[in-house]
Amino acid sequence: MEFLSIGVKIMPRKCSFCNEVENPQRRILANENDDAFICEYCVEGAYSIIYGEEKEFKEPKQSHNTEFKDITPKELKAYLDRYVIGQDRAKKVFSVGVYNHYKRLFKAELQDDDTELFKSNILLVGPTGSGKTLLAQTLAKFLDVPIAICDATSLTEAGYVGEDVENILTRLLQAADGDVQRAQKGIVFIDEIDKIARMSENRSITRDVSGEGVQQALLKIIEGSLVNIPPRGGRKHPNQEFIQIDTSNILFVCGGAFDGLETILKRKLGDKVVGFFDDAKEENKALLEKIEPDDLVHFGLIPELIGRLHVIASLNELNEEDMVRILTEPKNAIIKQYQKLFAIDGVNLKFEEDALRAIAQLALERKTGARGLRSIIEEMMVDLMFELPEYKDYDIVITKEVVKDNAKALLIKRKIS
Protein backbone atom coordinates (compact mmCIF):
# COMPACT_ATOMS: atom_id res chain seq x y z
CA MET A 1 0.00 0.00 0.00
CA GLU A 2 1.28 3.49 -0.85
CA PHE A 3 1.06 6.27 1.73
CA LEU A 4 0.82 10.06 1.42
CA SER A 5 3.07 12.12 3.69
CA ILE A 6 1.49 15.30 5.16
CA GLY A 7 3.77 16.97 7.63
CA VAL A 8 4.63 14.46 10.26
CA LYS A 9 1.46 12.41 9.68
CA ILE A 10 1.32 9.44 7.33
CA MET A 11 -2.14 8.82 5.94
CA PRO A 12 -3.39 6.04 3.68
CA ARG A 13 -4.85 7.14 0.36
CA LYS A 14 -8.65 7.38 0.46
CA CYS A 15 -11.18 7.61 -2.37
CA SER A 16 -12.60 11.16 -2.56
CA PHE A 17 -16.01 9.76 -3.59
CA CYS A 18 -16.79 6.71 -1.45
CA ASN A 19 -14.28 7.54 1.31
CA GLU A 20 -12.92 3.95 1.29
CA VAL A 21 -9.23 3.40 2.09
CA GLU A 22 -6.86 1.82 -0.45
CA ASN A 23 -6.21 -1.90 0.01
CA PRO A 24 -5.09 -4.84 -2.17
CA GLN A 25 -8.69 -5.34 -3.38
CA ARG A 26 -9.43 -1.62 -3.93
CA ARG A 27 -6.91 0.20 -6.12
CA ILE A 28 -6.74 4.00 -5.99
CA LEU A 29 -5.99 6.40 -8.87
CA ALA A 30 -4.53 9.85 -8.11
CA ASN A 31 -4.39 13.13 -10.02
CA GLU A 32 -1.12 14.79 -11.07
CA ASN A 33 -0.84 16.74 -7.80
CA ASP A 34 -1.52 13.60 -5.79
CA ASP A 35 -4.22 15.37 -3.77
CA ALA A 36 -7.41 13.88 -5.26
CA PHE A 37 -8.22 10.20 -5.44
CA ILE A 38 -10.78 7.82 -6.94
CA CYS A 39 -11.05 4.04 -6.51
CA GLU A 40 -11.61 1.59 -9.35
CA TYR A 41 -15.18 0.83 -8.23
CA CYS A 42 -16.21 4.49 -8.36
CA VAL A 43 -14.66 4.68 -11.84
CA GLU A 44 -16.95 1.82 -12.91
CA GLY A 45 -19.96 3.58 -11.38
CA ALA A 46 -19.09 6.86 -13.12
CA TYR A 47 -18.73 5.08 -16.46
CA SER A 48 -22.19 3.58 -16.03
CA ILE A 49 -23.76 6.97 -15.25
CA ILE A 50 -22.05 8.83 -18.11
CA TYR A 51 -22.62 6.26 -20.86
CA GLY A 52 -26.00 5.03 -19.66
CA GLU A 53 -24.96 1.39 -19.41
CA GLU A 54 -26.48 -0.74 -16.70
CA LYS A 55 -23.17 -1.93 -15.46
CA GLU A 56 -23.22 -3.74 -12.14
CA PHE A 57 -21.33 -1.90 -9.44
CA LYS A 58 -18.97 -4.49 -8.01
CA GLU A 59 -17.68 -4.35 -4.48
CA PRO A 60 -14.42 -6.18 -3.80
CA LYS A 61 -14.82 -9.83 -2.95
CA GLN A 62 -15.02 -10.53 0.75
CA SER A 63 -12.55 -13.00 2.13
CA HIS A 64 -13.88 -16.52 2.71
CA ASN A 65 -13.22 -17.95 6.13
CA THR A 66 -11.39 -20.95 4.76
CA GLU A 67 -11.34 -23.56 7.51
CA PHE A 68 -9.74 -26.95 7.49
CA LYS A 69 -12.45 -29.56 7.50
CA ASP A 70 -12.22 -32.32 10.08
CA ILE A 71 -11.08 -34.87 7.57
CA THR A 72 -8.52 -37.64 7.55
CA PRO A 73 -6.14 -38.88 4.83
CA LYS A 74 -8.44 -41.91 4.44
CA GLU A 75 -11.39 -39.63 3.69
CA LEU A 76 -9.31 -37.67 1.17
CA LYS A 77 -8.31 -40.89 -0.59
CA ALA A 78 -11.89 -42.18 -0.52
CA TYR A 79 -12.98 -39.01 -2.32
CA LEU A 80 -10.19 -39.45 -4.88
CA ASP A 81 -11.33 -43.05 -5.43
CA ARG A 82 -14.67 -41.72 -6.71
CA TYR A 83 -13.00 -39.81 -9.54
CA VAL A 84 -9.53 -41.31 -10.12
CA ILE A 85 -9.20 -44.95 -11.18
CA GLY A 86 -6.16 -46.97 -10.09
CA GLN A 87 -2.97 -45.25 -8.85
CA ASP A 88 -3.67 -46.50 -5.31
CA ARG A 89 -0.21 -45.76 -3.91
CA ALA A 90 -0.05 -42.31 -5.52
CA LYS A 91 -3.48 -41.41 -4.12
CA LYS A 92 -2.37 -42.47 -0.65
CA VAL A 93 0.88 -40.45 -0.79
CA PHE A 94 -0.91 -37.44 -2.27
CA SER A 95 -3.69 -37.55 0.34
CA VAL A 96 -1.18 -37.60 3.20
CA GLY A 97 0.80 -34.73 1.65
CA VAL A 98 -2.28 -32.54 1.17
CA TYR A 99 -3.62 -33.42 4.63
CA ASN A 100 -0.34 -32.45 6.32
CA HIS A 101 -0.17 -29.19 4.37
CA TYR A 102 -3.60 -27.96 5.42
CA LYS A 103 -3.22 -29.34 8.94
CA ARG A 104 -0.09 -27.20 9.20
CA LEU A 105 -2.08 -24.12 8.13
CA PHE A 106 -5.14 -24.49 10.29
CA LYS A 107 -4.21 -26.59 13.30
CA ALA A 108 -0.54 -25.96 14.08
CA GLU A 109 -1.40 -22.90 16.22
CA LEU A 110 -3.35 -25.17 18.58
CA GLN A 111 -0.06 -26.69 19.78
CA ASP A 112 1.76 -25.02 22.68
CA ASP A 113 5.37 -25.66 21.66
CA ASP A 114 7.52 -23.47 19.40
CA THR A 115 8.20 -26.13 16.76
CA GLU A 116 7.73 -24.60 13.31
CA LEU A 117 6.22 -26.80 10.62
CA PHE A 118 7.60 -26.23 7.13
CA LYS A 119 5.38 -26.85 4.13
CA SER A 120 5.90 -29.90 1.95
CA ASN A 121 5.20 -29.35 -1.73
CA ILE A 122 4.47 -32.36 -3.94
CA LEU A 123 5.99 -33.85 -7.09
CA LEU A 124 3.93 -36.29 -9.19
CA VAL A 125 5.88 -38.46 -11.63
CA GLY A 126 3.97 -40.40 -14.27
CA PRO A 127 3.22 -40.73 -17.99
CA THR A 128 0.87 -38.47 -19.95
CA GLY A 129 -2.79 -39.06 -19.14
CA SER A 130 -2.14 -41.05 -15.95
CA GLY A 131 -4.13 -38.70 -13.69
CA LYS A 132 -1.62 -36.18 -12.30
CA THR A 133 -3.70 -33.07 -13.00
CA LEU A 134 -6.92 -34.83 -12.02
CA LEU A 135 -5.55 -35.65 -8.55
CA ALA A 136 -4.88 -31.97 -7.83
CA GLN A 137 -8.16 -30.75 -9.35
CA THR A 138 -10.23 -33.29 -7.43
CA LEU A 139 -8.83 -32.50 -3.99
CA ALA A 140 -8.96 -28.74 -4.64
CA LYS A 141 -12.68 -29.14 -5.35
CA PHE A 142 -13.21 -31.27 -2.24
CA LEU A 143 -11.35 -28.82 0.03
CA ASP A 144 -13.01 -25.81 -1.63
CA VAL A 145 -9.72 -24.05 -2.33
CA PRO A 146 -8.80 -22.22 -5.56
CA ILE A 147 -6.44 -23.94 -7.98
CA ALA A 148 -4.34 -22.60 -10.85
CA ILE A 149 -2.99 -24.97 -13.50
CA CYS A 150 -0.16 -24.02 -15.82
CA ASP A 151 2.27 -25.63 -18.23
CA ALA A 152 5.94 -25.18 -17.33
CA THR A 153 6.93 -25.10 -21.01
CA SER A 154 5.14 -21.76 -21.47
CA LEU A 155 7.13 -20.08 -18.69
CA THR A 156 10.22 -17.92 -19.19
CA GLU A 157 12.50 -15.82 -17.05
CA ALA A 158 11.44 -12.22 -16.47
CA GLY A 159 12.49 -10.04 -19.38
CA TYR A 160 12.09 -12.70 -22.08
CA VAL A 161 9.22 -13.27 -24.50
CA GLY A 162 6.77 -15.68 -22.92
CA GLU A 163 4.83 -15.95 -19.68
CA ASP A 164 6.42 -14.70 -16.47
CA VAL A 165 6.54 -17.27 -13.66
CA GLU A 166 4.70 -14.80 -11.43
CA ASN A 167 1.67 -14.92 -13.76
CA ILE A 168 0.89 -18.28 -12.16
CA LEU A 169 -0.12 -16.34 -9.05
CA THR A 170 -2.32 -14.01 -11.10
CA ARG A 171 -4.21 -17.08 -12.31
CA LEU A 172 -4.59 -18.30 -8.73
CA LEU A 173 -5.93 -14.91 -7.64
CA GLN A 174 -8.43 -15.00 -10.50
CA ALA A 175 -9.50 -18.52 -9.46
CA ALA A 176 -10.08 -17.10 -5.96
CA ASP A 177 -12.31 -14.34 -7.41
CA GLY A 178 -9.81 -11.71 -6.37
CA ASP A 179 -9.79 -12.82 -2.72
CA VAL A 180 -6.12 -12.52 -1.70
CA GLN A 181 -6.52 -14.38 1.60
CA ARG A 182 -8.21 -17.30 -0.13
CA ALA A 183 -5.61 -17.38 -2.92
CA GLN A 184 -2.84 -17.57 -0.33
CA LYS A 185 -4.26 -20.93 0.84
CA GLY A 186 -4.80 -22.31 -2.67
CA ILE A 187 -3.09 -24.90 -4.85
CA VAL A 188 -0.85 -24.30 -7.87
CA PHE A 189 -0.35 -27.22 -10.26
CA ILE A 190 2.64 -26.90 -12.60
CA ASP A 191 2.53 -29.55 -15.32
CA GLU A 192 5.43 -30.76 -17.48
CA ILE A 193 8.02 -29.65 -14.95
CA ASP A 194 10.38 -32.20 -16.53
CA LYS A 195 10.43 -30.18 -19.77
CA ILE A 196 12.43 -27.38 -18.10
CA ALA A 197 15.20 -29.70 -16.90
CA ARG A 198 18.80 -28.73 -17.65
CA MET A 199 20.28 -30.58 -20.58
CA SER A 200 23.19 -31.62 -18.37
CA GLU A 201 24.07 -31.56 -14.69
CA ASN A 202 26.64 -28.81 -15.28
CA ARG A 203 25.28 -25.33 -14.72
CA SER A 204 24.79 -23.41 -17.94
CA ILE A 205 27.30 -20.66 -18.62
CA THR A 206 24.92 -18.93 -21.06
CA ARG A 207 21.49 -17.38 -20.55
CA ASP A 208 18.87 -20.11 -20.24
CA VAL A 209 15.39 -18.83 -21.04
CA SER A 210 13.28 -21.93 -20.46
CA GLY A 211 15.45 -24.33 -18.45
CA GLU A 212 17.51 -23.64 -15.35
CA GLY A 213 16.52 -19.96 -15.37
CA VAL A 214 12.83 -20.85 -15.07
CA GLN A 215 13.61 -23.35 -12.31
CA GLN A 216 15.37 -20.59 -10.38
CA ALA A 217 12.39 -18.27 -10.89
CA LEU A 218 9.98 -20.99 -9.73
CA LEU A 219 12.14 -21.66 -6.69
CA LYS A 220 11.54 -18.14 -5.38
CA ILE A 221 7.77 -18.50 -5.30
CA ILE A 222 7.66 -22.17 -4.28
CA GLU A 223 9.86 -21.76 -1.20
CA GLY A 224 7.65 -18.95 0.13
CA SER A 225 8.04 -15.23 -0.49
CA LEU A 226 6.12 -11.98 -0.92
CA VAL A 227 5.45 -11.48 -4.63
CA ASN A 228 4.03 -8.37 -6.30
CA ILE A 229 1.80 -9.32 -9.21
CA PRO A 230 -0.09 -7.26 -11.81
CA PRO A 231 -3.80 -7.57 -10.91
CA ARG A 232 -4.76 -8.53 -14.46
CA GLY A 233 -1.66 -10.42 -15.49
CA GLY A 234 0.77 -9.53 -18.25
CA ARG A 235 4.18 -7.93 -17.98
CA LYS A 236 5.16 -5.59 -15.19
CA HIS A 237 5.91 -1.94 -15.92
CA PRO A 238 7.23 0.81 -13.61
CA ASN A 239 4.01 2.85 -13.14
CA GLN A 240 1.79 -0.15 -12.53
CA GLU A 241 0.11 -0.91 -9.23
CA PHE A 242 0.52 -4.40 -7.81
CA ILE A 243 -1.18 -6.85 -5.50
CA GLN A 244 1.08 -8.56 -2.98
CA ILE A 245 0.75 -12.33 -2.56
CA ASP A 246 2.44 -14.32 0.20
CA THR A 247 3.26 -17.77 -1.22
CA SER A 248 4.32 -19.30 2.11
CA ASN A 249 1.05 -21.20 2.50
CA ILE A 250 0.29 -22.00 -1.13
CA LEU A 251 0.61 -25.71 -1.92
CA PHE A 252 2.66 -26.25 -5.07
CA VAL A 253 2.15 -29.53 -6.92
CA CYS A 254 4.48 -30.24 -9.84
CA GLY A 255 3.93 -32.99 -12.37
CA GLY A 256 5.87 -34.51 -15.24
CA ALA A 257 6.35 -37.64 -17.33
CA PHE A 258 10.15 -37.64 -16.87
CA ASP A 259 10.78 -39.75 -19.96
CA GLY A 260 14.22 -41.33 -19.61
CA LEU A 261 14.22 -41.37 -15.81
CA GLU A 262 13.95 -45.17 -15.92
CA THR A 263 17.35 -45.29 -17.64
CA ILE A 264 18.91 -43.30 -14.79
CA LEU A 265 17.29 -45.61 -12.23
CA LYS A 266 18.42 -48.76 -14.07
CA ARG A 267 21.97 -47.45 -14.14
CA LYS A 268 21.85 -46.77 -10.42
CA LEU A 269 20.09 -49.94 -9.27
CA GLY A 270 21.73 -52.42 -11.64
CA ASP A 271 20.47 -55.96 -11.11
CA LYS A 272 18.52 -55.11 -7.94
CA VAL A 273 15.36 -54.54 -10.00
CA VAL A 274 16.21 -55.10 -13.65
CA GLY A 275 15.57 -58.62 -14.92
CA PHE A 276 13.04 -59.62 -12.27
CA PHE A 277 10.02 -58.73 -14.42
CA ASP A 278 8.77 -60.28 -17.66
CA ASP A 279 6.73 -57.20 -18.49
CA ALA A 280 8.46 -53.86 -19.25
CA LYS A 281 5.59 -51.88 -17.71
CA GLU A 282 5.89 -53.77 -14.44
CA GLU A 283 9.64 -53.17 -14.44
CA ASN A 284 9.16 -49.42 -14.99
CA LYS A 285 6.55 -49.35 -12.22
CA ALA A 286 9.00 -50.96 -9.80
CA LEU A 287 11.75 -48.54 -10.86
CA LEU A 288 9.62 -45.41 -10.40
CA GLU A 289 8.69 -46.50 -6.89
CA LYS A 290 12.39 -46.17 -5.99
CA ILE A 291 12.84 -42.53 -7.09
CA GLU A 292 15.09 -40.47 -4.85
CA PRO A 293 15.92 -36.73 -5.03
CA ASP A 294 19.38 -37.42 -6.50
CA ASP A 295 17.79 -39.20 -9.47
CA LEU A 296 15.81 -36.06 -10.32
CA VAL A 297 18.96 -33.95 -10.03
CA HIS A 298 20.66 -36.30 -12.52
CA PHE A 299 17.63 -35.85 -14.77
CA GLY A 300 18.19 -32.09 -14.80
CA LEU A 301 16.19 -30.44 -12.03
CA ILE A 302 18.25 -28.15 -9.81
CA PRO A 303 18.91 -29.45 -6.26
CA GLU A 304 17.37 -26.34 -4.68
CA LEU A 305 14.04 -26.97 -6.44
CA ILE A 306 14.03 -30.67 -5.56
CA GLY A 307 14.73 -29.65 -1.97
CA ARG A 308 11.37 -27.83 -1.91
CA LEU A 309 9.42 -30.81 -3.31
CA HIS A 310 9.52 -33.08 -0.29
CA VAL A 311 6.70 -35.46 -1.23
CA ILE A 312 7.26 -37.58 -4.35
CA ALA A 313 4.52 -39.85 -5.71
CA SER A 314 4.81 -41.97 -8.85
CA LEU A 315 1.86 -42.85 -11.07
CA ASN A 316 1.76 -45.96 -13.24
CA GLU A 317 1.03 -46.21 -16.93
CA LEU A 318 -2.63 -47.13 -17.42
CA ASN A 319 -3.53 -50.50 -18.92
CA GLU A 320 -6.61 -51.59 -20.86
CA GLU A 321 -8.53 -52.61 -17.75
CA ASP A 322 -7.85 -49.20 -16.15
CA MET A 323 -9.08 -47.44 -19.29
CA VAL A 324 -12.36 -49.39 -19.35
CA ARG A 325 -12.93 -48.56 -15.68
CA ILE A 326 -12.18 -44.87 -16.34
CA LEU A 327 -14.83 -44.88 -19.07
CA THR A 328 -17.56 -46.23 -16.79
CA GLU A 329 -16.83 -46.10 -13.05
CA PRO A 330 -15.99 -42.56 -11.83
CA LYS A 331 -18.80 -40.32 -10.63
CA ASN A 332 -18.37 -38.13 -13.71
CA ALA A 333 -17.32 -40.93 -16.10
CA ILE A 334 -17.25 -40.05 -19.80
CA ILE A 335 -19.82 -42.72 -20.72
CA LYS A 336 -22.21 -41.41 -18.03
CA GLN A 337 -21.85 -37.89 -19.43
CA TYR A 338 -22.74 -38.98 -22.96
CA GLN A 339 -25.64 -41.09 -21.71
CA LYS A 340 -27.01 -38.01 -19.96
CA LEU A 341 -26.61 -35.92 -23.14
CA PHE A 342 -28.52 -38.52 -25.15
CA ALA A 343 -31.19 -38.95 -22.45
CA ILE A 344 -32.06 -35.24 -22.70
CA ASP A 345 -33.22 -36.02 -26.27
CA GLY A 346 -35.13 -39.10 -25.12
CA VAL A 347 -32.50 -41.58 -26.31
CA ASN A 348 -30.96 -44.46 -24.34
CA LEU A 349 -27.26 -44.83 -25.16
CA LYS A 350 -25.62 -48.20 -24.50
CA PHE A 351 -22.07 -49.47 -25.01
CA GLU A 352 -21.25 -53.14 -25.42
CA GLU A 353 -18.31 -54.41 -23.36
CA ASP A 354 -16.29 -55.13 -26.52
CA ALA A 355 -16.86 -51.55 -27.67
CA LEU A 356 -15.46 -50.18 -24.41
CA ARG A 357 -12.39 -52.38 -24.76
CA ALA A 358 -11.91 -51.25 -28.37
CA ILE A 359 -11.99 -47.60 -27.23
CA ALA A 360 -9.45 -48.37 -24.49
CA GLN A 361 -7.15 -50.15 -26.96
CA LEU A 362 -7.32 -47.20 -29.37
CA ALA A 363 -6.32 -44.77 -26.60
CA LEU A 364 -3.38 -47.00 -25.68
CA GLU A 365 -2.27 -47.16 -29.33
CA ARG A 366 -2.34 -43.36 -29.55
CA LYS A 367 -0.35 -43.10 -26.28
CA THR A 368 -2.60 -40.30 -25.05
CA GLY A 369 -3.58 -41.91 -21.77
CA ALA A 370 -6.98 -41.30 -20.21
CA ARG A 371 -7.22 -37.79 -21.63
CA GLY A 372 -7.49 -39.24 -25.14
CA LEU A 373 -10.66 -41.20 -24.38
CA ARG A 374 -13.00 -38.23 -24.78
CA SER A 375 -11.65 -37.25 -28.21
CA ILE A 376 -12.06 -40.85 -29.45
CA ILE A 377 -15.70 -40.95 -28.34
CA GLU A 378 -16.36 -37.45 -29.67
CA GLU A 379 -15.09 -38.44 -33.13
CA MET A 380 -17.28 -41.52 -33.05
CA MET A 381 -20.42 -39.70 -31.88
CA VAL A 382 -20.47 -36.64 -34.15
CA ASP A 383 -22.75 -38.12 -36.84
CA LEU A 384 -25.09 -39.65 -34.25
CA MET A 385 -25.37 -36.43 -32.27
CA PHE A 386 -26.03 -34.47 -35.46
CA GLU A 387 -29.21 -36.51 -36.01
CA LEU A 388 -29.95 -37.14 -32.32
CA PRO A 389 -33.26 -35.20 -32.08
CA GLU A 390 -34.71 -37.55 -34.73
CA TYR A 391 -33.99 -40.63 -32.59
CA LYS A 392 -36.34 -39.88 -29.70
CA ASP A 393 -37.67 -43.07 -28.06
CA TYR A 394 -34.80 -45.14 -29.53
CA ASP A 395 -32.08 -47.22 -27.91
CA ILE A 396 -28.70 -46.65 -29.57
CA VAL A 397 -26.14 -49.42 -29.07
CA ILE A 398 -22.43 -48.86 -29.72
CA THR A 399 -20.66 -52.06 -30.81
CA LYS A 400 -17.01 -52.95 -31.36
CA GLU A 401 -17.55 -52.51 -35.12
CA VAL A 402 -18.63 -48.89 -34.60
CA VAL A 403 -15.30 -48.17 -32.89
CA LYS A 404 -12.97 -50.19 -35.12
CA ASP A 405 -14.64 -50.17 -38.54
CA ASN A 406 -16.69 -46.96 -38.42
CA ALA A 407 -19.85 -49.08 -38.77
CA LYS A 408 -23.33 -47.73 -38.02
CA ALA A 409 -24.63 -47.95 -34.46
CA LEU A 410 -27.58 -50.25 -33.75
CA LEU A 411 -30.90 -48.35 -33.59
CA ILE A 412 -33.71 -50.06 -31.67
CA LYS A 413 -37.14 -48.42 -31.48
CA ARG A 414 -38.57 -48.62 -27.97
CA LYS A 415 -42.14 -49.79 -27.53
CA ILE A 416 -44.24 -47.04 -26.02
CA SER A 417 -47.03 -48.52 -23.93
Curated annotation (Swiss-Prot):
List of residues binding Zn(2+): C15, C18, C39, C42
What keyword terms does UniProt attach to this protein? ATP-binding, Chaperone, Metal-binding, Nucleotide-binding, Zinc
| SUPFAM superfamilies the record matches | P-loop containing nucleoside triphosphate hydrolases
Where ATP binds, per the record, is at P127, T128, G129, S130, G131, K132, T133, L134
Superkingdom is Bacteria
Among InterPro entries, the record links this protein to: AAA+_ATPase, ATP-dep_Clp_protease_ClpX, ATPase_AAA_core, Clp_ATPase_C, Clp_protease_ATP-bd_su_ClpX, ClpX_bact, P-loop_NTPase, Sigma_54_int_dom_ATP-bd_2
Pfam families per UniProt? AAA_2, ClpB_D2-small, zf-C4_ClpX
Cross-referenced SMART domains: AAA, ClpB_D2-small, zf-C4_ClpX
**One of the record's GO molecular function terms:** zinc ion binding
Q: Name one GO cellular component term.
A: HslUV protease complex
Q: Which family does it belong to?
A: Belongs to the ClpX chaperone family.
Identify the NCBIfam families for this entry: clpX, PRK05342.1
**Which protein are we looking at?**
ATP-dependent Clp protease ATP-binding subunit ClpX
Q: What is the organism of origin for this protein?
A: Campylobacter jejuni subsp. jejuni serotype O:2 (strain ATCC 700819 / NCTC 11168)
Instruction: State the encoding gene.
Output: clpX
